[in-house]
Every structure is written in structure tokens, then in C-alpha cells.
Amino acid sequence: MDLFKQLEYRGMVKDVSDLELAKQLLNEQKIKFYVGYDPTGESLTVGHLVQIVRMLYLQKHGHTPVVLIGGGTGLIGDPRETSERSLLTLEKSLENAQKIENQIKGLIKGNVEFVNNYEWLSKIDLISFLRDYGKHFSVSYMLHKDTVQKRLESGISYTEFSYMILQSIDWLNLYQNRDVKIQFGGSDQWGNLTSGLELIRRVLGKNDAVGLSSPLLLKADGTKFGKSESGALWLDKELTSPYELYQYFLNSSDTDIEQFLKLLTLIEQDEIEAILETHREKPELRHAQKVLAKAVVELVHGKEELETALQVTEALFSGEFNGLTKSAYKTLESVIDVVRFNGESLIELVVKSKLASSNREAREFISNGAISIQGEKITDSMYNVGETSKAFDTYAIIRRGKKKYALIVF
């Protein structure tokens, strides 16, 4: 199966500006292609993984990704369907841009190029912008773009209205100076992709470039992919732990699992089909979900963080915390109830840990042998908690029975 058909199999193709040219470039040549990221936040989210995995997949087949970080366009803001974006300061835009570049460098290694459009957009004066670029865009053409249409009633500023011109300048710049032949983006970027192709044609009188969009990833129930109850799922482990990421994908529905395996992993087609077949035989074992969760966490955070996520998952499932690594204990701090030890008595600590509702109840639990710390059953209510055995001189698990526990941090 050729590369373009592989992209179609994976659900990575929605709109293509020139189908035959796209097939020729991807199947018969080794080309440069680009994907752009505006630094609207300090981290990318799991929603960005679709484009990242596609870059990795094309790189694997000999093409060169060019990652454009929008330090310039981030100052303007891509029009949203609902309301105007808050403007970033130059300092914040460039700071976010550097963080996102570093994040992507951790994901895409080897033959890859990075550019920041602030380098060229910041050098264009207003007169040059209007004469050299603005003259190639008719207002009626711009008004017909979906993102603009959806904002006409509620209002759109000239700042955001001009965003497509800036992104088109990016496309022209990369086509002229880096021989970039394809721009990839989500289907919500289709208007910007085609505007860039039109600018190349008008300025250079030719156009052998291609725009290619992918469907926006929605879950089977129609909700947006990449959101949890606590909000966005970030690729920065300080914002979303590898354990949380693992749990998100482990809990994927059976109806979502096939598209997630195709869009968010580099697992090849034959193996994906085998995984799905095994899963269909015994869906209650959640085989496909486990493969997916492992693949995504390892891709984003590496093997070591995956092992930590697996350790914590197993500990919480089994109720056994022996042998955890320091990293696993650190993860537990954000997952289960945590109590900071400040010299409390055992009775006070049991109440503080929410394992008892009162001192009297705590005393009963202790005398009945229901309380243990770090696996040691405690029956003496006068026990000195400070002398307990600690993992890494910092952590201990206090528990009542098998399923009620908390993490003590000394």
C-alpha cells in the first residue's frame, strides 16, 4: 500500500487541494512539508498529537517535517468560532513559542527543521504588508472563509480578520526559501491553507504546492477529544502527569479505540488489525485500550515515565504499594489523598487522612487492627508515627482495610 493510501487508512486525510499532485509528492518524491503551531499556551495538548503523529509517520517514510512556531501569528490570534482571543504580549508569545519548540523537539528527532515566523513577519512594515500582500486578497474572498463567516454576526476585529494573510505569507516564505511542498493542518485550518496556495500562485505565477487537511478528532459521542473532567490534557508532564494521560486512553470507549490507534500511534496497519481482532474476541479485557495507552504515553514521555504510570496503575488496582519507585510515589501525590505529617499523633493522623470521622472511631479502628502504615499493622494508639518506616525517607501509605488509604508525606 502506498503512503497516501496509508494516510487515508489512518483517517489523516479530509480535504486535498490537488489529489494527483499530493499522491505524486508523497508516493514518488522525498519532500519537505510543514505544520504550524501558534503559541497560545505554554504547552501543546493531546489534541495536537494528530499532527505530531502524522509528522512522525511521514518522517519515517523519508519526508522532512518543517515545524513552524507562530511567534508572530501568535501575537494576532487565529479567529475562533465564538469570540475574540486575548492578545498575548510579545514577551509571552516568544516565551510560549520557545517552550512549544522544546516540547516538539522532545517528540520529533532526527531529520526535522524548526522555524519561527516572528523572524520574517516582524520585519514587514505596514506599507509593504498592504502593497506586497494585501493587494492579492479580495475582501469578498476573505469573507467567504468559514472561520470569518461564523464570526460576522458576533463581530471580528480587523486584527483577526487579517490572520489568514499572515499565515499565507508563512506558506509563501517556506515555499520560496525552504522548498516546502505541502502544508498539513486540521480541517478548521482549510481556509488558511487554501489562502496560502492562492498567494503563492498570485506572487510567483505558479503553484506546485499542496494543502492537505485532516478531520478534527471527535469522540464517538460527539464531544471534543482531549478534554477530561479537570480540563485540557497537556503534553507537559508538569501540567498533566503521564499517569493521567495513561488513564485517559485506558478508559477510551470501544467505539473510539480504532480511530485512536490509527491517528495517535505509529503502529502499522497489520498490527492494528490484529490488536482490534484480539480486542473484539474479549472486549472486557480492554486489550486495545492497554496497547493504545502504553503507545501514547511512551511516545510522549518515554519508557521510564510509562513504567511509572504502569506501576501506579497496578498499585491502585491491587492495593499493594510495595516496591514503588520514587517517581511513582511522586505521581501518587496528585492521585490519592495526601496528608503532610506535622507531628500529629496516630489518632490525629487517622482522622486527618479521612480514614476515620472522629478520634473515638480512629481509636476503635486502631485497637481492632484495621490501621496499617507502610504495610505494618498498628494496634497501639500511642504509636510514634515519626518513627515509622518511610520510602525514600519521605513517603508512607496509611490505610484502613484494603481499599481506603492515603499518602503520608514527611
Swiss-Prot record:
Taxonomic source organism: Acholeplasma laidlawii (strain PG-8A)
GO cellular component, one term: cytosol
Entry binding sites for L-tyrosine: 34, 163, 167
Main function: Catalyzes the attachment of tyrosine to tRNA(Tyr) in a two-step reaction: tyrosine is first activated by ATP to form Tyr-AMP and then transferred to the acceptor end of tRNA(Tyr).
InterPro entries per the UniProt record, alphabetical: aa-tRNA-synth_I_CS, aa-tRNA-synth_Ic, Rossmann-like_a/b/a_fold, S4_RNA-bd_sf, SYY-like_C, Tyr-tRNA-ligase, Tyr-tRNA-ligase_bac-type, Tyr-tRNA-ligase_bac_1
EC number assigned by the record: 6.1.1.1
Protein name as it appears in the record: Tyrosine--tRNA ligase
Binding annotation for ATP: 227
Keywords: Aminoacyl-tRNA synthetase, ATP-binding, Cytoplasm, Ligase, Nucleotide-binding, Protein biosynthesis, RNA-binding
